[in-house]
């Protein structure tokens, strides 16, 4: 399975803001972006005027890195969003939010989307009672995501339950049963990622 191999902190520095790719570490003084908030490389501290195309490209790269999606798959999401009813940019973000690895992250299982992706890949979750180990699996409204019986006893999942995350409006959680439910599709107001999706649409519309 293709994946990003570049250091997470370099990705944040390149985009010029924290993408919170390392979870809790991003909130501490150990965060590389807090110490060196400029782009990586020899000329990282020099300021350049970015063209309109450059702004659009950076916005797309930012979204890809936040959700851990590579170019080919991201383009597929865009095509699906463009064909669907509604606003293309918002449709795109909804598709990304409804990925299983992101839903697992939103439910509080994993300090980062990267960790949540690994948990899904390792087979810790069921969707409607069936094991799913594909991070890109798109969940639907009324789907129930549960932690497998075997995984519930591990220290990692006990820690997640003891430190619950505030859930977005489109999800419900039942900590006692190690489960969460998708109660609706997320609205744009529910999606708190620092992405201007309009710029992404402009880029792909050329």
From Swiss-Prot:
Residues 98-164 form the S4 RNA-binding domain. PROSITE patterns: RIBOSOMAL_S4 (PS00632), S4 (PS50889). One of its GO terms (biological process) is translation. InterPro entries: Ribosomal_uS4, Ribosomal_uS4_bac-type, Ribosomal_uS4_CS, Ribosomal_uS4_N, S4_RNA-bd, S4_RNA-bd_sf. GO terms for cellular component: small ribosomal subunit. CDD domains: S4. PANTHER family: 30S 40S RIBOSOMAL PROTEIN (PTHR11831), SMALL RIBOSOMAL SUBUNIT PROTEIN US4M (PTHR11831:SF4). Part of the 30S ribosomal subunit. Contacts protein S5. The interaction surface between S4 and S5 is involved in control of translational fidelity. This is Small ribosomal subunit protein uS4. The gene is rpsD.
